Amino acid sequence: MRLRFLLLLILLSNTLSSAQTAKFDMLDWMTMDPFGSHMSGTGTPMWTVMDAPHGKFYWVKSPKGYPWDVKSFDSNFIYDTITEVSWSDPQTFKRHIGPNGKGYPISPRFVPYVPGAAPTKLWTITIPSSSTNFEIHSSCSQYRMSNLGYAKTEIWGPFYESLGGDLPPNTETLHLNWLWSCDSSYNNCKVKERFTLMRAYGSVKWENYKLSSGQYVLQQASLRNVASLGVTSAVHPCWN
C-alpha cells in the first residue's frame, strides 16, 4: 500500500510539473498574422513579409519594400541576419555572420515558460566577439568587415500591457533585449535595443538605449499600435 501511495505521488508530481510548463513559439511573437494589414503609429511603420520556403521573414519599414530587417529561422533559433545601411538603396546592407553563417541567434525558436508565473527573464543567449562579425555592403558584392564585440540577447516576460491604439488592452507581451559592445563578462553593454512583441501583431514597440554612468538612457522609440490596411513585398535585389 505504501509503495502504491508513493508511486501515485510521483505520478501526480510529474503530471503537475508537465502541466505547469509550456513553450512560446517565438515566430508567432515576431511576425504579424497575414490579414492584409501592417502596423503603424508614432514611429516607423512595419510590414511583416514571410518567406517560409527560404526560412526568412522581413520587417519592412516602407511601402516601397525596403529598408528592412531580415530574420532567418529554423527549428532551433531565430537569427538576426540582415539590416539596412541606407533607406534609399536596397543594394546597401549589413549582413550579420554569426557563429554558423545564418546571423546572430537572437532567440530560441521555442522558449519555455510557466503559465501564470510573474514576469521574469526567460532566456539569455551570449555571443562572443568572435561570432559578431558582420559585412557592411556598399553594393551587392562589395563590402568591408566590422564587429559588434561581445553581445547578448534576453527574453523577458510575459508582461500584460495596454499600448493603446488598435491593440487590445492588458494583452500579453514579451520583451526581447538585444545588447552589444559589452565587456567580456557580458556586462556594461554600451547599447541596448528593446523590442516589445505581441502575438498576432509582431513587433509593436522599439526602444534604443545607450549606457551612461551605469544607467540606460532612452535615445529613440517607435510605437506601432495601429493596424493599417495595406501590404507590400520585400525588395531585395542582392539575394533570392
State where each predicted segment sits.
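Conserved functional acidic sites
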Residues: 20-240
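Sec-dependent N-terminal signal peptides
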Residues: 4-13
